[in-house]
């Protein structure tokens, strides 16, 4: 062990770092992060004496004590000073632009006349409705809480986290609440006719009725049916109690109602008002220790650059409003502060901050000292975060879409449309993701003893399918039951065709084990109760896989005249599936179309490569770098868009870390005729052992109609070891 003291220079500051060399470079990076707030993955550390880049191979004991921290985005160490100078010049221009904008504000400030506060104060009253127990109770009753809790746990399990903390569970539940709300609430362009349901045409505004005013509908839009003489009213309700009932509206109604749901489930939440005509929600994440952007209209979370970068919005004021106060959060949503500042002409910056502080003090007047101190600390931390965010580099690898909610022509008119192809968040710089899919392999393996028992007993194919459908029905009953108390009954009778043959019960052992289920014979001996064995999340993540696999197995067996031992081979029987490795792709769609979705065994999920139509790749690395000889693989088409199916591809293997690749299989002009169609391929390359496998997809079915590639599943099968 060598104790070192480094002096790290970053921008205009120097930091002393005490460090033990045996701790490794990773610890040094985190020490530097604690001082500079530059994340470890964004650090380039340079020894100033010889201008060498510090890497894992560097001798930290003999390294120069003077280090320089530079941007990870620089092309080389040699041009770092030039890049810094360029950044300094750009910063100077931005600061000058800010000064000019502030100077301009002085001339327009006289026009304020309380306009800014007048726009904010009504929302301060509105957010207090979210604290009403009656409104919260009404909202709570409409949410399938157990279902969302289960989905939250499964989402964490897919990342390998089977024992999450409360903060992690809360954050995962919040995201599931967002996705549920996106599907439950309805966007209204023109409401359908109240009488016949046909299209309507706007006729202007009408006078609100007393019943509409009772729920804050001061504005009522009037529409005329194109097919009948009926007039349809569209009250713009502001009371979330009514919105919980109607479940429809535009961005104002969506954000208003969703923020109530967030408060109902205990999240620190605030309504975000964008003065360029949009509204959304923020919630505080205790696991991430920061406020999270949530847009219920778009179903997008933690993507604050969505509006400036994706929608091309020219932001000016973005104000957060909650029961605890009012805050200017514009800097979270822009990387062009000097441009935004030039558009902030309602009042001066100092007057704006004074006004927000006044509103905040009003809301916090009755708080106890401890609560007030916590809020003030969080406020300070947020302001520091906003300043860091303003000057941090934008992630160029993430592509943000134009607006998706609302009529196409309306979005185009507002210049928020984007493009037809770019309709979701995607990334061209994917992380290495771990495949949590050992349960998929175990489920596939568990069908062999079941089928073997059927063959040994001479069961006809028709009867085999009947028995498999009984197993499937039990799994359906379990999946539909509350996830904490899953239980189903299997009736036993060797002679009754409508009951499960008792002699086949032992053959189910491996399947139940793969699903984290247990069986217990009832006291009458005529049925078996199947229930969870305590590993609730493992059962939840595995049940959909087993159901999809059983559906496929029943469909495959229907093609057989007879079932014998020779039938129990690939592709009917899928043994020795490779699992638990890691995967890296050329691109992916966030959050649902990530690379590991191709290995999760679930038909409805898929890997999407937004720019993969004319070429993309996905690499699989085995667990612990184990060498495998691949003997077969399968690909499955996704749920929709046949034009995105892969048509030509090459499968390669490597045993030297990817320096060289051996072609294992090559396919051209492949066509998936159906959705969820599985195609099986045997590998003829003899005896090649590899721990890296790469698919290079060369083209999709119709490269002229899409830029995307999508794939429902990839399964790799190794030789028996």
Swiss-Prot record:
Q: Where does Zn(2+) bind?
A: 193, 196, 225, 228
Domain of life, source organism: Eukaryota
Question: Top-level EC class, please?
Answer: hydrolase
Entry keyword set: Cytoplasm, Hydrolase, Metal-binding, Zinc
Q: How is the cofactor bound?
A: Binds 1 zinc ion per subunit.
Major localisation: cytoplasm
Q: What is its EC number?
A: 3.5.1.52
The prosthetic group or cofactor this protein requires is: Zn(2+)
Any one Pfam family here would be Transglut_core
**Catalytic-site annotation from UniProt:** 251 (nucleophile), 278, 295
Entry's InterPro entries? Galactose-bd-like_sf, Papain-like_cys_pep_sf, Transglutaminase-like
Q: Does Zinc count among this protein's keywords?
A: yes
- Gene Ontology cellular component annotations, sorted alphabetically: cytosol
According to its UniProt record, where is this protein located? Answer: Cytoplasm
**GO molecular function terms attached to this record:** metal ion binding; peptide-N4-(N-acetyl-beta-glucosaminyl)asparagine amidase activity
Can the keyword rRNA-binding be found in this entry's annotation?
no
Reactions it catalyzes: Hydrolysis of an N(4)-(acetyl-beta-D-glucosaminyl)asparagine residue in which the glucosamine residue may be further glycosylated, to yield a (substituted) N-acetyl-beta-D-glucosaminylamine and a peptide containing an aspartate residue
Q: GO biological process annotations for this chain's record?
A: response to microbial phytotoxin; response to ozone; response to salicylic acid
What is the stated purpose of this protein? Specifically deglycosylates the denatured form of N-linked glycoproteins in the cytoplasm and assists their proteasome-mediated degradation. Cleaves the beta-aspartyl-glucosamine (GlcNAc) of the glycan and the amide side chain of Asn, converting Asn to Asp. Prefers proteins containing high-mannose over those bearing complex type oligosaccharides. Can recognize misfolded proteins in the endoplasmic reticulum that are exported to the cytosol to be destroyed and deglycosylate them, while it has no activity toward native proteins.
Q: Could you say which protein family the record assigns here?
A: Belongs to the transglutaminase-like superfamily. PNGase family.
Protein name, entry field: Peptide-N(4)-(N-acetyl-beta-glucosaminyl)asparagine amidase
Gene name for this UniProt entry: PNG1
């Amino acid at each position: 062990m060598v104790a070192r003291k480094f002096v790290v220079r970053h921008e205009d500051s120097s930091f002393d770092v005490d460090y033990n060399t045996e701790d490794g470079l990773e610890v040094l990076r985190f020490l530097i992060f604690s001082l500079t707030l530059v994340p470890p993955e964004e650090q380039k550390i340079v020894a100033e004496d010889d201008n060498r880049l510090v890497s894992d191979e560097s001798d930290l004991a003999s390294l120069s004590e003077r280090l320089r921290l530079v941007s990870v985005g620089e092309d080389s160490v040699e041009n770092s000073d030039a890049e810094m100078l360029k950044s300094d010049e750009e910063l100077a221009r931005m600061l000058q632009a800010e000064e000019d904008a502030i100077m301009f504000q002085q001339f327009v400030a006289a026009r304020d006349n309380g306009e800014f506060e007048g726009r904010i104060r009504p929302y301060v009253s509105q957010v207090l409705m979210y604290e009403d127990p009656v409104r919260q109770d009404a909202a709570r009753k409409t949410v399938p809480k157990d279902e969302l809790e289960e989905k939250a746990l499964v989402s964490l399990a897919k990342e390998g986290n089977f024992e999450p903390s409360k903060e992690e569970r809360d954050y995962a539940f919040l995201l599931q609440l967002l996705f549920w709300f996106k599907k439950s609430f309805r966007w209204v362009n023109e409401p359908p006719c109240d009488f016949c349901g046909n299209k309507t045409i706007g006729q202007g505004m009408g006078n609100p009725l007393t019943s509409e005013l009772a729920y804050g509908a001061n504005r009522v839009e009037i529409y005329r049916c194109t097919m009948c003489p009926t007039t349809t009213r569209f009250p713009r309700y502001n009371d979330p109690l009514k919105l919980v009932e109607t479940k429809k509206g535009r961005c104002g109604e969506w954000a208003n109602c969703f923020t109530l749901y967030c408060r109902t489930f205990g999240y620190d939440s605030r309504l975000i008002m964008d003065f360029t005509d949009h509204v959304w929600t923020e919630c505080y994440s205790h696991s991430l220790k920061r406020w999270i952007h949530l847009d219920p209209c778009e179903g997008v979370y933690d993507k604050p650059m969505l509006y400036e970068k994706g929608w091309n919005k020219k932001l000016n004021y973005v104000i957060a409003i909650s029961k605890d106060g009012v805050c200017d959060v514009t800097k979270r949503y822009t990387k062009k502060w000097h441009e935004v500042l030039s558009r902030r002409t309602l009042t001066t910056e100092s007057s704006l901050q004074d006004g927000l502080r006044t509103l905040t003090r009003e809301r916090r007047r009755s708080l106890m000292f401890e609560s007030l101190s916590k809020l003030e600390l969080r406020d300070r931390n947020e302001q520091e975060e906003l300043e860091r965010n303003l000057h941090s580099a934008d992630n160029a690898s993430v592509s943000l879409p134009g607006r998706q909610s609302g009529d196409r022509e309306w979005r185009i008119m507002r210049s928020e449309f984007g493009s037809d192809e770019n309709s979701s968040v995607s990334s061209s710089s994917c992380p290495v993701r771990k495949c949590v899919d050992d349960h998929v392999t175990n489920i596939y393996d568990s069908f062999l003893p079941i089928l073997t028992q059927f063959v040994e007993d001479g069961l006809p194919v028709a009867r085999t399918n009947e028995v498999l459908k009984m197993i499937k029905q039990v799994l359906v009953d379990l999946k539909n039951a509350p996830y904490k108390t899953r239980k189903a009954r299997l009736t036993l009778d060797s002679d009754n065709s409508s009951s499960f043959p008792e002699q086949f019960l032992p053959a189910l052992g491996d399947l139940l084990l793969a699903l984290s289920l247990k069986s217990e014979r009832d006291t009458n001996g005529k049925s078996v109760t199947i229930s969870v064995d305590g590993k609730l999340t493992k059962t939840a993540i595995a049940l959909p896989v087993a159901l999809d696999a059983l559906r496929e197995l029943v469909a495959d067996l229907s093609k057989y005249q007879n079932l014998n031992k020779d039938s129990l081979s690939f592709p009917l029987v899928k043994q020795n599936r490779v699992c638990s490795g890691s995967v890296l792709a050329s691109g992916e769609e966030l959050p649902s179309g990530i690379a590991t979705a191709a290995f999760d065994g679930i038909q409805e999920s898929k890997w999407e490569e937004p720019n993969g139509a004319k070429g993309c790749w996905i690499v699989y690395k085995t667990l612990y770098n184990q060498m495998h000889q691949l003997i077969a693989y399968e690909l499955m088409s996704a749920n929709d868009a046949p034009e995105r199916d892969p048509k030509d591809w090459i499968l390669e293997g490597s045993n030297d870390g990817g320096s060289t690749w051996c072609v294992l299989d090559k396919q051209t002009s492949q066509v998936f005729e159906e959705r969820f169609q599985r195609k099986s391929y045997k590998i003829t390359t003899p005896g090649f052992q590899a721990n890296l496998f790469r698919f290079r997809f060369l083209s999709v079915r119709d490269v002229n109609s899409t830029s995307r590639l999508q794939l429902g599943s990839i399964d790799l099968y190794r030789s028996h070891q």
